[in-house]
Curated annotation (Swiss-Prot):
Could be a mediator in iron transactions between iron acquisition and iron-requiring processes, such as synthesis and/or repair of Fe-S clusters in biosynthetic enzymes. Gene3D superfamilies: Fe(II) trafficking protein YggX. InterPro entries: Fe_traffick_prot_YggX, Fe_traffick_prot_YggX_sf. Keywords: Iron. GO terms for biological process: cellular response to oxidative stress. The lineage of its organism: Bacteria, Pseudomonadati, Pseudomonadota, Gammaproteobacteria, Alteromonadales. One of its GO terms (cellular component) is cytosol. This is Probable Fe(2+)-trafficking protein. It comes from the Bacteria. One of its GO terms (molecular function) is iron ion binding.
Length: 92
């Protein structure tokens, strides 16, 4: 049976992560409070940020920026803003 968490991002009970994906106290907070679905949404935003801002994960400042964005997205309800990005419209 999958473990569930009360996801702070989705604001509902949802399937939790299988294991702690991020180190330290922040990783524990994510593991305890963020669902697998919300983590997947963050990963998509993270990829966009890394690509559009040309972040280097070997650079401490870039990793710090990304961590701040992650906390803002998952826990503070702030969306990730990427300059020039326009979401694709559905052709219904």
């Amino acid at each position: 049976m999958a473990r569930t968490v009360n996801c702070v991002y989705l604001k509902k009970e949802a399937e939790g992560l299988g294991f702690q994906l991020y180190p330290g106290p922040l990783g524990k907070r994510i593991f305890d409070n963020v669902s697998k679905e919300a983590w997947g949404l963050w990963q998509a935003k993270q990829t966009m940020l890394i690509n559009e801002k040309k972040l280097n994960m070997m650079n401490v400042e870039d990793r710090g920026f990304l961590e701040t964005q992650m906390v803002n997205f998952l826990f503070e309800g702030k969306d990730v803003e990427i300059e020039g990005y326009v979401p694709q419209k559905d052709d219904d």
